[in-house]
Swiss-Prot record:
Keywords: Ribonucleoprotein, Ribosomal protein, RNA-binding, rRNA-binding
Originating species: Mycolicibacterium smegmatis (strain ATCC 700084 / mc(2)155) (Mycobacterium smegmatis)
Subunit organization: Part of the 30S ribosomal subunit. Forms a tight heterodimer with protein bS6.
GO molecular function: small ribosomal subunit rRNA binding; structural constituent of ribosome
Protein name as it appears in the record: Small ribosomal subunit protein bS18B
Ribonucleoprotein found in the keyword field: yes
Pfam families (alphabetical): Ribosomal_S18
């Protein structure tokens, strides 16, 4: 005998769209030497935060990822957390 599917649909949450910070502020650039800016896009475990979390556009998220990777190579940012 087949089960009836009586689940309620999930309530719709309002989608909060975030604007890209770098698109709204045209003069702000992404540089690997600006560690204060790059640390806002890195989690406490050392991972780069996702685009849906940061609210950046595709191009600026890629630029942030490249800048973080360059800063890690020059030892300005840590590669990851040493605690497990």
């Amino acid at each position: 005998m087949a089960k009836s599917n009586k689940r309620r649909p999930a309530p719709e949450k309002p989608v909060k769209t975030r604007k890209c910070v770098f698109c709204s502020k045209k003069g702000q650039t992404i540089d690997y030497k600006d560690t204060a800016l790059l640390r806002t896009y890195i989690s406490e475990r050392g991972k780069i935060r996702a685009r849906r979390v940061t609210g950046n556009c595709v191009q600026h998220q890629r630029d942030i990822a490249v800048a973080v990777k360059n800063a890690r190579e020059v030892a300005l940012l840590p590669f990851g957390s040493s605690t497990r």
